[in-house]
Design a protein with these regions (language model features):
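Short terminal alpha-helical segments
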Residues: 395-441
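Core of folded catalytic or high-affinity ligand/protein-binding domains
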Residues: 44, 441-445
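Mixed-charge, Lys/Arg-rich low-complexity intrinsically disordered regions
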Residues: 1-21
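Intrinsically disordered, low-complexity, charged/polar segments
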Residues: 60-138
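Short beta-strand-centered aromatic/proline hotspots
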Residues: 34-45
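Basic/aromatic-rich interaction segments and small domains that mediate binding to polyanionic partners
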Residues: 43-67
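Concave beta-strand-loop units of leucine-rich repeat
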Residues: 143-376, 380-397
Length: 445
């Protein structure tokens, strides 16, 4: 059976609800690996259905003959403990390429209290990756989590054996990093210093997934033999960062060298690059197959070269300080773009913003604190073209002029801050600022 349910062709919610039946098993291909995974429909509501992840994970598309061997996927990776994952998901976002394999009996499950989106194969992928880790390290990790009150001595300090993160106050006291082997639950290292033993230690500890390295002085940061999933790093001296295939998130902070290159086995495919920019500078880091890019602290930035550097983006997130964004029409070149978010950015019109037909894969459009004229036109233009759209806090030129240096501007229009509280707080800030400026003027005089 090879039925494709296409909800991205503006299929009504009622039609999706009628197509789905309890017991139906659907299959999809996970994007990064192209492997097939499966899930089953186990409950139907008014606007949402409950699915449960199944344990099918293969390079071969499943057939009806595979149904009898499928079981609920039990999660044991990271903090999960033999847990079945099932979740409510909206009919209107049912995945476009889901293929109906057949229908089998469901098994008893407790009431579903999880709400989210349809599966993407990440749980099956995580399970496979977790099962490839050294068994003794995984076993020690799970034991440490189960003994949350068990304490040990590290660098002369008493800490919990399940401790997740260590900082320089501990690292600087170590004469031998092997002392950290007493911490099987260790998953994050945060440092502002150079520790010669750190990288070799990371290379043999497979469950340490995060490194935050501030003000790194190395020119060549070789992490290629580590097992890091996330890296946050800063340092003007860095010219090369070498990553393992396992790294999926890298965050760059502070001033960056114009020579900076990032080397990854997958060249950025299925990787998230976050950059907290200074002076709107974004070096050409490589990663030509990058799929997710998030730029923060934009002040005055052009997208002119961005799309040629990263032509395969699925997700583009842009956040101002607030700031101005130029050459917005360049986004039309990102034909695979599925998600676009913009926040606190100005300097563009509705005419410059891409037309829906130029972004055929776009499913999510989140715009907040953008020019009011553009916001109104874009919202109307995309209303029937994307499933997930939020256009919030449209701003006029007058508002921008008055609030450019207002630290409370994020409260204006917030659903969490009432208008009266914002007005009172703004008045207090203005009065405090006036007094401060008067005091500075008197001291200078």
């Amino acid at each position: 059976m090879d039925i494709i349910v296409d909800s991205d062709s503006n299929m009504p919610v009622d039609m999706n609800r009628k197509l789905l039946q309890i017991g139906d098993v659907y299959a999809l291909q996970e994007k990064e690996t192209a492997k097939w995974f499966a899930f089953q429909i186990v409950n139907l509501g008014e606007e949402n259905a409950v699915y449960v992840d199944l344990d099918y994970w293969s390079e071969q598309e499943p057939t009806q003959g595979d149904l009898k061997s499928m079981d609920y996927l039990r999660l044991n990776h990271h903090l999960w403990n033999n847990t079945i994952h099932y979740c409510w998901a909206p009919y209107e976002l049912f995945p476009i390429r889901a293929k109906l394999i057949g229908n089998i009996d469901i098994r008893p499950l407790d009431e579903c209290k999880c709400h989210g989106n349809w599966p993407d194969g990440s749980q099956q992928k995580w399970t496979e990756s977790w099962n490839e880790l050294p068994e003794e390290q995984v076993r020690a990790f799970k034991v440490a989590l189960a003994q949350k009150d068990h304490t040990i001595i590290i660098a002369g300090k008493e800490v919990k054996k399940c401790l997740y993160g260590v900082f320089d106050d501990t690292l600087s006291l170590l004469s031998d990093f092997s002392e950290l082997d007493k911490l099987p639950g260790l998953g994050r290292i945060v440092t502002n210093k150079e520790h010669p033993q750190m990288i070799p230690f990371l290379e043999r500890r497979h469950l340490i997934r995060e490194l935050i390295w501030n003000d790194c002085k190395l020119k060549d940061v070789d992490l290629s033999c580590t097992h890091l999933e996330e890296l946050e790093i800063s340092g003007i001296d860095i010219e090369i960062i070498r990553l393992p295939a396992r790294t999926k998130i890298i965050t760059l902070k502070g001033k960056l060298s114009p020579k900076l290159k990032i080397i990854s086995p997958n060249d950025g495919y299925f990787m998230i690059l976050r950059v907290e920019m200074q002076d709107d500078f974004l070096p050409d880091v490589g990663l030509s197959r990058l799929t997710t890019l998030v730029l923060k602290h934009i002040q005055n930035f052009s997208l002119k070269t961005l799309t040629s550097r990263f032509p395969d983006l699925f997700w583009l997130g842009l956040t101002g300080k607030p700031g101005y964004i130029r050459d917005v029409d360049e986004i039309t070149k990102l034909h695979d773009l599925e998600t676009l978010t913009m926040d606190d950015l100005f300097g563009f019109s509705a005419d410059e913003f891409p037309q829906p037909e130029s972004l055929p894969e776009l499913k999510r459009l989140w715009l907040e604190s953008i020019p009011s004229d553009a916001a109104k036109a874009i919202k109307k233009r995309y209303k029937s073209n994307v499933h997930d759209m939020h256009v919030l806090k449209p701003r006029s030129d007058e508002w921008l002029h008055e609030n450019l240096n207002n630290p409370l501007r994020y409260w204006d229009g917030s659903e969490f801050i009432s208008k009266s509280k914002y007005s009172k707080s703004l008045a207090l800030w203005k009065e405090a600022r006036r007094r401060l400026l008067e005091a500075v003027a008197l001291s200078d005089g």
